Amino acid sequence: MSAPRHILVAVAWPYASGSRHLGHLAGAYLPADIFARYHRTVGNRVLMVSGSDVHGTPITVRADEEGVSPQEIVDRYHAEFVSNWDKVGIQWELYTSTGTDNHHAVTQDMFRHLAENGYIDTKTSEQLYDPQAQRFLPDRYVEGTCPHCGYESARGDQCDNCGRQLDPTDLISPKSRLTGATPELKGTEHYYLLLSKFQDRLLEWLRGRQGWRKHVLNMAIGFTEEGLQDRAITRDLEWGVDIPEPYDTIGEGKRIYVWFDAVIGYLSAAKEWAENTGNPEAWRDWWENPEAESYYFIGKDNIVFHAVIWPCQLLGYGGLNLPTDIPANQYVTFKGDKASASRGIGRSIGWYADRLEPDALRYALT
């Protein structure tokens, strides 16, 4: 009999900024749970992890809109997510959040390693600034027209319509979500992940993937072949993971970018799980063991972050396993529109979970 395989099941981290819709369950969480259950049944060692993403502008924008603290928003929706997973029978080894001390420490450790290895540097760039609110407008604090597909409600970090990654300065006719003002350009210093240094290694790795879904591989290779651009990994925000010493000298009010820290959550969750089991080094069996396998269950809009940026972070850190597969699903539609939590399209997981037995709901979605 062959030895049990080590299977890491890494599942997308939902923003704790609002209820998640049925597309999230059908596209990421239920497939991951079925996959993990199978591997447990046949005797493999499964580590299925995820958690609530508690940083970034989705949370701070919601808090600003409601006039409450970001922590109040996080506490509300993290509790809702945990309840929903229980209702629909999702079985985790660990469901945590990016708000833990452990996650902050692991994120800062990766930041330091990448900086020490020459993959992070500072740059000054012009970013959108709201003259009325007198503050910079990172990510979802600005909306405008997508330069790629013409969608008129694209956000400053990504277009919901075509899925392309964006910078706020890419938007056509941008408007501040704080005041409705037309932003100005103003210089600000930030840390950048030097993705351009990974161009050849990443492309070689991607071209060697076999068995991946065509739309995942085509998107990742296409994005990389266009030429990887260095990407800012800090933001002008008060909410998020602190920039670690000795790199915290570029100015007040800056934090690590949410997507740099969110994908690190798969690693920090594994370390937290290992600590909880009383064997703090157990995480290495899934992350440093060359025979271990890792599967990332995500939605289409997260492909670039998981198939391009996260592998670059892992390559730059060194010694950690790259993804075995990234079985990302396409968008779920609701009455003809793409289901979207940020745009309020589609019913929430909780709405269905409160009305249907879990087995009936799971059967209908598979």
Feature annotation, model-predicted:
Residues 2-205:
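N-terminal, positively charged nucleic-acid-binding surface of large information/translation enzymes
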Residues 2-50, 102-106, 172-366:
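Structured secondary-structure scaffolds
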